[in-house]
């Protein structure tokens, strides 16, 4: 009997073709490419992106995003730790399974990140935006500029935090970018974390976020009604609630079309808590919300999140560590123009759960929805991303699963570990070169 061939994303034709012709400017960028591009290329192929789009997307990633990922992470080097993953790595792929759309998120890092010039990585995002804006029509920074000014630290704030030693083990990430890939084009989004601004000003994250968005409503009054409804729900939980605002995001497009999303972290990991997030404590009770609630309950039964109180863990996990933890729940609320109520999206925090069982639950959900291609390819894709891993024991591939329901249609996305994929474990890429080319990216402080 012949052996069963294991799918392997390092065999991707697009990845191999591009790799044959690249001259990397430094060793760090070479490592980032060979660590992440095999999985990226395979995900695009299986999702049905045409060949031209695959090359364009990976070309943009190679030339305009990888230069902003910083030094390549190892267990011993000094690097900027990003909130994006529990391992502090600044890049993550995700897949909208209902629409077969790929997205990636990254925290831009440059040579000043973590140095006295930019100790909390406030400024590097501007350089990253300068690289992306010429590549895609329609990018608009009006909302971003407003929210960033209100919710991230300036140089004076940074000096105050450092002089008074206020940060400690606090998360230092303040902003990230995400590209939703539609054909060969992309829609740009930003995520903003106000935790450091809260430390610097003494104001709560809730106060900072809602005050900033209310000021945004002065020029965009069509967003005020859903914002007020969300604030009333958050306030109704009281000062000792296990749920609290954590971050927000917005689309970097025409302000009249941009959506603002406010994210709530819920420490109480139970189906009842998730149902409360979904219905905003019963405030959302229309037919669409209730239909989505039934699917949410179905997903809960399939994924089997263990119930309990979960603080967000500190510190970051060391690379290579097998997680023995579970994260809190999360939800976001989209503020749509001219809608009275926000639209919920909930997150099943699956990091630390057995990935095989999570995949089994997802495939069952896909089959019940009639997403036959996704159901047939999903497990093979996971094996292709990490062909040398023990697929029976993995518990760190699925970081989150998000779920929303709009106009009779469920939307589900998976957020996946995207680091050292394909043949990386048996390659020479991770072996330090004897005399590496000097990187133009310095090792930032932690």
Curated annotation (Swiss-Prot):
Q: Which GO terms describe its biological process?
A: indole alkaloid biosynthetic process
The UniProt function text for this chain reads: Tryptophan dimethylallyltransferase; part of the gene cluster that mediates the biosynthesis of fungal ergot alkaloid. DmaW catalyzes the first step of ergot alkaloid biosynthesis by condensing dimethylallyl diphosphate (DMAP) and tryptophan to form 4-dimethylallyl-L-tryptophan. The second step is catalyzed by the methyltransferase easF that methylates 4-dimethylallyl-L-tryptophan in the presence of S-adenosyl-L-methionine, resulting in the formation of 4-dimethylallyl-L-abrine.
> NCBIfam families of this UniProt entry?
arom_pren_DMATS
The molecule here is called Tryptophan dimethylallyltransferase
Encoding gene (name): dmaW
Organism name: Arthroderma otae (strain ATCC MYA-4605 / CBS 113480)
Q: What is its EC number?
A: 2.5.1.34
UniProt keyword annotations, A-Z: Alkaloid metabolism, Transferase
Domain of life, per the record? Eukaryota
Pathway in which this enzyme or protein is active: Alkaloid biosynthesis; ergot alkaloid biosynthesis
The entry assigns this protein to a family as follows:
Belongs to the tryptophan dimethylallyltransferase family.
User: So where does L-tryptophan get bound?
Assistant: 83-84, 92, 193, 246
The protein's matches in InterPro entries, at most eight in alphabetical order, are given as:
Aro_prenylTrfase, Aro_prenylTrfase_DMATS, DMATS-type_fun
* GO molecular function terms listed in the Swiss-Prot or TrEMBL record: tryptophan dimethylallyltransferase activity
Pfam families per record: Trp_DMAT (PF11991)
Name residues in a coiled coil.
none
């Amino acid at each position: 009997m012949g052996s069963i061939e294991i799918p392997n994303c390092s065999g991707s034709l697009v990845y191999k073709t591009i790799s044959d012709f690249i001259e990397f400017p430094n060793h760090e960028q070479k490592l980032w490419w060979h660590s992440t591009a095999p999985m990226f290329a395979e995900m695009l192929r299986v999702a049905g992106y045409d060949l031209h789009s695959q090359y364009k997307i990976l070309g943009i990633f190679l030339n305009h995003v990888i230069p902003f990922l910083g030094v390549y992470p190892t267990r011993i080097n000094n690097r900027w730790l990003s909130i994006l993953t529990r391992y502090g790595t600044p890049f993550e792929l995700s897949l909208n399974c209902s629409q077969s759309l790929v997205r990636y998120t990254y925290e831009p890092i440059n040579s000043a990140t973590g140095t006295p010039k930019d100790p909390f990585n406030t400024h590097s995002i501007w350089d990253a935006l300068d690289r992306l804006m010429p590549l895609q029509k329609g990018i608009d920074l009006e909302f971003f500029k407003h929210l960033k000014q209100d919710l991230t630290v300036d140089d004076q704030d940074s000096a105050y935090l450092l002089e008074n030693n206020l940060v400690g083990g606090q998360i230092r990430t303040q902003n990230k970018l995400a590209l939703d890939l539609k054909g060969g084009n992309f829609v740009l989004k930003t995520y903003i974390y106000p935790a450091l601004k809260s430390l610097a000003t003494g104001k709560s994250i809730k106060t900072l976020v809602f005050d900033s968005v209310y000021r945004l409503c002065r020029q965009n009054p069509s967003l005020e009604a859903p914002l007020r409804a969300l604030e009333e729900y958050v306030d109704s939980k009281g000062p000792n609630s296990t749920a609290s605002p954590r971050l927000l995001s917005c689309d970097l497009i025409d302000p009249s079309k941009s959506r603002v999303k406010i994210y709530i972290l819920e420490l109480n990991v139970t189906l009842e808590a998730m149902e409360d997030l979904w219905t905003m404590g019963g405030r959302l009770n229309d037919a669409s919300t209730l239909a989505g609630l039934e699917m949410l309950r179905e997903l809960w039964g399939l994924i089997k999140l263990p119930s309990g109180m979960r603080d967000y863990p500190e510190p970051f996990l060391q690379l290579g560590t097998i997680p023995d933890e579970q994260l809190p729940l999360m939800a976001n609320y989209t503020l749509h123009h001219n809608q009275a109520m926000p639209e919920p999206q909930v997150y099943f925090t699956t990091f630390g759960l057995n990935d095989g069982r999570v995949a089994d639950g997802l495939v069952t959900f896909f089959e019940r929805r009639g997403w036959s291609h996704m159901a047939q390819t999903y497990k093979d894709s996971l094996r292709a991303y990490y062909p040398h891993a023990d697929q029976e024991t993995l518990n760190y591939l699925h970081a989150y699963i998000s779920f929303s329901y709009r106009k009779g249609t469920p939307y589900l996305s998976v957020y996946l570990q995207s680091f050292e994929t394909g043949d990386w474990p048996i390659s020479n890429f991770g072996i330090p070169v004897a005399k590496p080319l000097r990187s133009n990216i310095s090792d930032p402080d932690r």
